[in-house]
Regions:
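NAD(P)-dependent Rossmann-like dehydrogenase/reductase catalytic/cofactor-binding core
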Residues: 2-8, 74-81, 225-329
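Rossmann-like NAD(P)(H) cofactor-binding subdomain of soluble oxidoreductases
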Residues: 65-144
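Short alpha-helical
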Residues: 42-46, 98, 127-128, 164
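Helix-loop-beta segment of a Rossmann-like dinucleotide-binding subdomain
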Residues: 111-114, 143-156, 208-220, 269-277
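NAD(P)+-binding Rossmann beta1-loop-alpha1 motif at the extreme N-terminus of oxidoreductases
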Residues: 1-68, 74-75, 82, 89, ...
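Rossmann-fold dinucleotide-binding core
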Residues: 123-196, 202
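Active-site-proximal catalytic alpha-helix in oxidoreductases
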Residues: 190-217, 223-236
Length: 329
């Protein structure tokens, strides 16, 4: 990728996060023509014909027209104008479901391999999601931001190759109004990921197992609050032993602060509950299974999370069996 050539970015997953990400990358940044395309599935026809209408709190309502729109990964992989260009950034924003699909193998047709090949950017929940990509694309730059829709956007490198791709992303986001975008070390990024589990690994599964209880109501219920606090505390005590670094009280809210904040957040439902109610697979492995397995590799137990994982995994299995007696998860 020369300094004068267009930069080709492909977003795999045209949901809310993917479309927002795309809209903030597409355009001319510091003289570079960044062309962002989308791989859509169920919404392909609508986006191909009409583009994307975004409604945001920080940036208002606006319209975004992608450079190209594809109905499948295969179609996007075939489209490189006869090999005239590569996908410089392959950005994955789909749900991470390693028990169902291998994301690295799925995106393989899109990736130009090697140090100077495609940079793989993983905007997905959970921990351990990068391992299959490291195994498949050992020389490619791999980045795993925290949530783009949070108050700040940390972008960090998860491979041993150059970090120029990440610095480019940070500069493009900053130029387009995301002022808190910043580069982070792999260790700092992993720490942020583990801290996010305090919410995702405690409240999401507990909401499903308690019959669809919203986060705020769980935080106000004395028994559930005790349970949630214990789950968060388990992460707070285990993660530093795995990462070798303590949480920073200035950057990472304590369980007490998280629960206090949750009391006031009465809107919305946890994503795992929405998936459960819609009959979709839940992100059990990356939010619960992977942390438990990573801890075990270091000789550590996470009994609270393991209990949630065991119960919810069986509940999902039973639900699938009831819907289709031949289904096996």
């Amino acid at each position: 990728m020369s300094d004068s050539a267009p930069v080709h970015v492909l977003i795999v997953g045209a949901g809310a996060v993917g479309c927002f990400y795309a809209s903030k990358l597409h355009g001319i940044h510091s003289g570079r023509d960044v062309r962002v395309s989308l791989v859509c599935r169920s919404n392909y026809k609508a986006i191909a014909e009409n583009g994307v209408q975004l409604e945001t709190h920080s940036f208002g309502n606006y319209h975004f027209t992608p450079y190209r729109v594809f109905s499948s990964i295969k179609q996007a992989g075939d489209y490189t104008e006869g090999g005239a260009f590569q996908w410089d950034y392959v950005v994955v924003t789909t749900k991470a479901l390693p028990d169902i699909t291998n994301d690295a193998l799925d995106i393989a047709p899109l990736v130009t391999r090697g140090v100077d090949g495609s940079c793989i950017v993983l905007i997905q929940n959970g921990v351990g999601i990068e391992e299959v990509h490291r195994a498949e694309f050992g020389q490619n730059p791999i980045a795993k931001p925290n949530s783009l829709l949070s108050d700040s956007t940390l972008l960090g490198q998860l491979s041993s190759v150059t970090d120029k791709h990440i610095h480019q992303l940070v500069s493009w986001f900053t130029a387009n109004g995301i002022r808190d975008a910043e580069f982070a070390s792999e260790l700092s990024l992993q720490q942020t990921r583990w801290h996010k589990l305090c919410i995702n690994a405690s409240m999401n599964p507990s909401s499903v197992l308690s019959g669809g209880t919203p986060n705020a109501r769980m935080a106000l219920d004395s028994e559930l609050r005790t349970h949630l606090h214990a789950c968060m505390n388990e992460i707070f005590t285990t993660a530093p032993k795995i990462l070798g670094i303590e949480f920073d009280a200035k950057k990472h809210a304590s369980p007490d602060r998280i629960l206090k904040s949750t009391e006031r957040n009465t809107g919305g439902k946890p994503s795992m509950l929405l998936d459960w109610q819609a009959g979709r697979p839940m992100e059990l492995e990356v939010i619960l299974g992977n942390p438990i397995r990573i801890a075990r590799r270091d000789g550590l137990d996470m009994p609270r999370l393991q209990t949630l994982y065991a119960l919810l995994k069986m509940a999902q299995t039973r639900k699938a069996e009831e819907a289709n007696p031949t289904a096996k998860l």
